[in-house]
Swiss-Prot record:
Gene3D superfamilies: 3.10.20.10, Cytidine Deaminase, domain 2 (3.40.140.10). One of its GO terms (biological process) is Mo-molybdopterin cofactor biosynthetic process. The keyword Cytoplasm applies. The keyword Cytoplasm applies. InterPro entries: Cytidine_deaminase-like, FdhD. It comes from the Bacteria. The active site is at C107. Required for formate dehydrogenase (FDH) activity. Acts as a sulfur carrier protein that transfers sulfur from IscS to the molybdenum cofactor prior to its insertion into FDH. This is Sulfur carrier protein FdhD. NCBIfam families: fdhD_narQ. Belongs to the FdhD family. SUPFAM superfamilies: Cytidine deaminase-like (SSF53927).
């Protein structure tokens, strides 16, 4: 159990017709305001663990950085809930970058990205890895077994970067998008290649989740939950295999089925 993920709190638990006084683990909720080059960039409500990775991954997802070398300096003030980031020369553009702009589809098969920065940074996956069906099941089981923070609180999302053979790193957060940003930040900080990896995820596969996977360059996304229609439309166009409802010995493959191998 991460000391930063939860806090013990007295509760009254109703059981067998009466209340019992107990202590329970409650997931921490923490606002983190990110400033970039002296300007407020965003405030993220998150779990206060691995905040450096969260900031790096979030900035990369937003298109503000490509690698950690784009960051000249970063200070995390965990007590006050601030992250101060200074980008290297030629980094973040001026004010227009802070306001997201809607980009709709134009003509032909143009992608229906939500925002301009998504259009710039999402990658179409060509090739990608293959995964055996049995390995999909084994990896989801491993995520569940190693998700100690969720087991204690019931209030956290978990995301793992893995090869078809083993877990590489697991991150947890109250926000499913934050858990993915922490993975992204970990990979950038430690220079971990992502193209030969997959994501194992506990949450719903929304369009935002799918776009984060695309920006990381990951070709396979496994989830125990359901996808949304827009997520699957994007997965089709971006070349990402989405596996959902991965529970027990069964799962659904929604897009690019050829990457999942039977036998």
């Amino acid at each position: 159990m991460s000391g930063f993920a939860a806090k013990r709190r007295p509760i009254a638990k109703y059981r067998n017709g009466r209340f019992v006084e107990e202590e329970d683990e409650i997931a921490l909720e923490f606002p983190l305001t990110i400033t970039v080059n002296g300007e407020e960039f965003a405030t993220i409500v998150c779990t206060p663990a691995h905040l450096d990775e969260l900031v790096i991954g979030f900035l990369a997802s937003e298109g503000a950085i490509r690698t950690c070398s784009d960051i000249k300096g970063m200070t995390i003030d965990g007590e006050r809930g601030f992250a101060y980031v200074e980008l290297a020369a030629g980094g973040l553009p001026a004010k227009q970058f802070y306001a997201k702009r809607f980009i709709g589809s134009c003509c032909g098969k143009s992608r229906q990205f939500y925002f301009y920065n998504d259009m710039k940074t999402a990658k179409t996956i060509v090739g990608g890895i293959t995964v055996k069906a049995d390995d999909c099941i084994r990896l989801m089981k491993a995520l569940h077994e190693r998700s100690t923070d969720f087991a204690a609180t019931g209030g956290l999302h978990n995301a793992a970067l893995a090869t078809p053979d083993e877990m590489v790193v697991i991150r947890s957060d109250i926000g499913r998008h934050n858990a993915l940003d922490k993975l992204y930040g970990y990979c950038l900080r430690h220079q971990v290649a992502m193209k030969d990896k997959l994501i194992v995820f506990s949450g719903r596969v929304s369009s935002e989740v799918l776009l984060k996977a695309a920006k990381m360059g990951v070709s396979v996304l496994l989830s125990k939950s359901a996808p949304t229609t827009l997520a699957l439309d994007l997965a089709d166009e971006l070349g990402i295999t989405v596996v959902g409802f991965l529970r027990g010995q069964a799962f659904n493959v929604y897009t690019h089925e050829s990457r999942i191998i039977i036998g």
